[in-house]
């Protein structure tokens, strides 16, 4: 029997029903973005997706989307690997995203899911002779892993698919069965997240996150040639660690047992943001508490993505137009203030 979810009670689950969707260049009612059971991507996994976040800055009354052009650049590159000709540019998609968010009118953190998939109702495994569909939807969204005191991970028995099987450089719909198998096994065994190894036995990433460790004063993360996603949160974190925090960061392969001996471990991703790991395979990482570098990094990251760090402000795209108003003061002298338009 299907269990109905009470969305008013289930606070950790984002609302499944946005009001609007972006579909092939237009913002339409969400219910209009529906497809048949024989849709090619639904049957064969011939689609790709991206994940972006919007952060509400209450001080400025503004919603900022973090690095949208970079996300859409990778989105378009991934489409090429599936032989898709989308007919849109990263700039076009960014404009469509902003229009969608203005229609939704979110005044809180949200998550945006762009999709490109073969929408033909057709039987037969192939990538040629098909027409892609481009769509987006946005939902209210909080913490992905929901573990403020540290994440417990398990090294999965499932191996990460290699670049010669399904390229890790793209977020392809079908390849995430690999992640789902690992994630569910870990959660059912009492852990919060899974870590996957590649064919060479090296640590790749979490089910949907990149992984970093601190050992002997050096921050280490696997190279993109170890079958990991070229994540923009990963790139952001590397830059913050090096330029803002003054740490040495190197990219090299990581053995499983190195994690057990690490001083700190943390996961990064658009959804997961900065998620410190405090236990791996029932072993404490460091002293079993969130380490100082991960704690500082998490704070800096949240300030950055919400548009509060001037030097990285260019990464944050404001959604709502800002107008300047003149407000009377008690002294009779007018003062200029700013407010966001379209955010009601």
Where are these regions (language model features)?
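Short secondary-structure junction motifs
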Residues: 109-111, 191-192
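Helix-start/capping segments and mature chain N-termini
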Residues: 1-88, 92-99, 117, 122-344
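Short secondary-structure junctions
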Residues: 103-110, 245-247
